[in-house]
A protein has these predicted regions:
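Positively charged, low-complexity intrinsically disordered leader regions
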Residues: 1-26
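Short beta-strand segments enriched in small/hydrophobic residues
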Residues: 27-37
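Short, ordered loop/turn segments at secondary-structure junctions
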Residues: 35-37, 64-66, 94-96, 122, ...
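Glycine-rich phosphate/diphosphate-binding loop of Rossmann-like nucleotide-binding domains
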Residues: 37-49, 132-194
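Short beta-strand elements in bilobed, periplasmic/extracellular small-molecule ligand-binding domains
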Residues: 52-67, 183-186
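Non-catalytic terminal and connector segments of soluble metabolic enzymes
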Residues: 54, 81, 108-111
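Short, well-structured alpha-helical segments in soluble
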Residues: 73-85
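Anion-binding alpha/beta catalytic cores of soluble intermediary-metabolism enzymes, centered on
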Residues: 90-154, 172
């Protein structure tokens, strides 16, 4: 068993992002939308806003009450309009149960899709297109693995992922296999996981 200190990788990523943001002619603006009564989401968003500010990105949190919207179409239209005002958008999941998450996510312009959850970005990742926007936790996990092994080509590396979510497990599986790792995916229904 090995413990990896991720702070060094995190610092490098944030320093690199801050440097790139500093070269831009304008301050990037990011919209973060919550529309649920999920308390952990509020904590995640608070941390995202703080981290964005640290690297020079202006993050605006739209904490929407699900009662404001009659149905998915209304919320999806709201998110679609944000594409005109913001450079990037996060729809923090989960949304309230009355909304179809996929329909709302598809209203994000794929170039503005911070979490890489639009069909276009998922397809790019599967096709190993370098323009794919990848969910942050999956990308960070991948960067940590590359840093730990000291190379980008992960040939002969065997990796077990214990997660199959669309935010972490599935995109991390794709990133690793795109870089020649051999990957096993386990989850809550995997028998005899020890």
């Amino acid at each position: 068993n090995m413990i990896i200190d991720c702070n060094e990788v995190r610092k490098k990523i944030l320093d690199d992002v801050k440097e790139e943001v500093g070269k831009l002619p304008t301050t990037p603006k990011m919209a973060i939308v919550t529309c649920s009564y999920d308390e952990p989401s509020q904590i995640y968003v608070k941390n995202k806003v703080k981290t964005a500010g640290e690297v020079g990105i202006e993050a605006v949190h739209f904490n929407l009450d699900p009662k404001m919207f009659y149905d998915t179409d209304e919320l999806a239209d709201y998110v679609k309009r944000l594409n005109q005002q913001y450079h990037s958008i996060i729809v923090q999941l989960p949304l309230h149960e009355k909304f179809n998450e996929k329909q709302v996510l598809e209203m994000i312009d794929p170039l503005h899709d911070v979490d890489g959850l639009t069909n276009e970005n998922i397809a790019k990742l599967v096709q190993n297109d370098p323009r794919a926007i990848v969910p942050a936790t999956a990308q960070a996990s991948f960067e940590i693995i590359k840093h730990d092994v000291g190379r980008s080509d992960l040939s002969e590396l065997n990796v077990t992922i214990i997660n199959r979510s669309h935010l972490i497990g599935k995109p991390l599986f794709q990133l690793l296999t795109n870089h020649n790792a051999t990957v096993t995916v386990c989850h809550s229904r995997t028998a005899d996981l020890h």
